[in-house]
C-alpha cells in the first residue's frame, strides 16, 4: 500500500515561517509531545504539512539545540565519525547532541574539508596525499626507459642499413643480440668521434696554430691582414688578365725557370 503524501493540494502554506507559527508549534509540542508529524499541523492549528513542521522543530525550535560555532572537541568527533560513516550526516548527528545533520554537513564542507586538505590529508578516505616527488621520479624513470628503447631502435636500424640485418632474427639468442648491439654501439661512437675530430681540424689552418695566436695576439691580426691583402691582389690580377691570352707561354716559362735552376745547382 502506497503512503499518501502529507501535503494536500490546496489550503497549505509555503515559504518562511512566522513568529506566530513558531509559537503555536513550540507550545503544542512542549505540552503534548511528538505524537505524529502528520497530525500535529491540524491539532496545532497550522496550515503546514507534517514534513515542514518536523524540519522546523528539529533544526530550529527544539530547546536542546546548541547555538554558536562548533567546538574543537566536536570538530574532532565529526572527523572520527566521518572516517567510519562517510557522508551519512543524519547518523553522525545522532552521536553529537545539540547539532543538526544540516549544520554538521555545512560545517564539514566549509571548514573541516579545507583544513584537512591544508594538512595533506584526503577528506574522502582520511589518508595522506601521495607525494608529488614520487610521481615525478616514476615519470623520469619511464621517460629514461623510453629514450633508451629509442636509442636501441636507432642502433638496430643502423645495423640494417649496413647490411647486417641478417645477423639479427627472431631466432637469435639474447646473448648474440647483445654482442651485436654492443659492437654497433662501439662502431657508432668511433664514427662520431672521427667526425668530431675532422670537424675540429677544419677550424685550424696548417700555417697558423691556436697556441701561436694565444702567445702572440698581434701576430693573429698581422697574419689575417696579410692573407686578406694576398687574396685581394690575386683577385685583381685574375680580373686584369686577358681571357684570350694563351696559357702555353706560362708552361714554357716554367720550363725555362726549372732549367736555369738546375744549371745553378750544378755550377754551385
UniProtKB/Swiss-Prot annotation:
Domain HTH myb-type: 9-61, 62-116
Superkingdom of the source species: Eukaryota
Single annotated GO MF: DNA binding
Record's GO cellular component terms: nucleus
Described purpose of this protein according to its UniProt entry: Transcription factor.
Residue spans binding DNA: 37-61, 89-112
Subcellular location: Nucleus
Encoding gene, per UniProt annotation: MYB315
Known tissue expression: Expressed in roots, stems, leaves, seed pods and flowers. Strongest expression in the stem.
UniProt KW S-adenosyl-L-methionine keyword: no
Species whose genome carries this gene: Antirrhinum majus (Garden snapdragon)
Designated name of the protein: Myb-related protein 315
Transcription regulation found in the keyword field: yes
Amino acid at each position: 500500500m502506497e503512503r499518501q503524501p502529507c501535503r494536500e493540494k490546496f489550503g497549505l502554506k509555503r515559504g518562511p515561517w512566522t513568529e506566530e507559527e513558531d509559537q503555536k508549534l513550540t507550545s503544542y509540542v512542549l505540552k503534548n509531545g511528538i505524537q505524529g508529524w502528520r497530525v500535529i499541523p491540524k491539532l496545532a492549528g497550522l496550515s503546514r504539512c507534517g514534513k515542514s513542521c518536523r524540519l522546523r522543530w528539529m533544526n530550529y525550535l527544539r530547546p536542546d539545540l546548541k547555538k554558536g560555532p562548533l567546538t574543537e572537541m566536536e570538530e574532532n568527533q565529526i572527523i572520527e565519525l566521518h572516517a567510519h560513516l562517510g557522508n551519512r550526516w543524519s547518523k553522525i548527528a545522532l552521536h553529537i547532541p545539540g547539532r543538526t545533520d544540516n549544520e554538521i554537513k555545512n560545517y564539514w564542507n566549509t571548514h573541516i574539508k579545507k583544513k584537512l586538505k591544508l594538512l595533506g590529508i584526503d577528506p574522502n578516505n582520511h589518508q595522506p596525499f601521495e607525494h608529488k616527488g614520487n610521481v615525478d621520479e616514476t615519470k623520469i624513470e619511464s621517460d629514461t626507459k623510453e629514450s633508451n628503447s629509442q636509442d636501441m631502435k636507432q642502433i638496430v636500424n643502423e645495423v640494417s642499413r649496413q647490411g647486417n640485418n641478417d645477423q639479427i632474427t627472431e631466432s637469435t639468442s639474447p646473448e648474440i643480440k647483445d654482442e651485436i648491439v654492443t659492437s654497433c654501439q662501439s662502431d657508432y661512437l668511433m664514427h662520431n668521434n672521427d667526425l668530431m675530430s675532422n670537424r675540429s681540424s677544419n677550424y685550424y689552418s696548417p700555417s697558423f696554430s691556436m697556441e701561436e695566436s694565444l702567445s702572440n695576439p698581434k701576430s693573429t691580426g698581422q697574419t689575417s691582414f696579410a692573407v686578406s691583402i694576398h687574396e685581394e691582389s690575386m683577385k685583381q690580377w685574375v680580373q686584369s688578365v686577358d681571357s684570350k691570352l694563351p696559357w702555353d707561354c706560362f708552361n714554357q716559362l716554367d720550363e725555362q725557370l726549372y732549367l736555369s735552376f738546375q744549371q745553378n745547382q750544378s755550377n754551385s
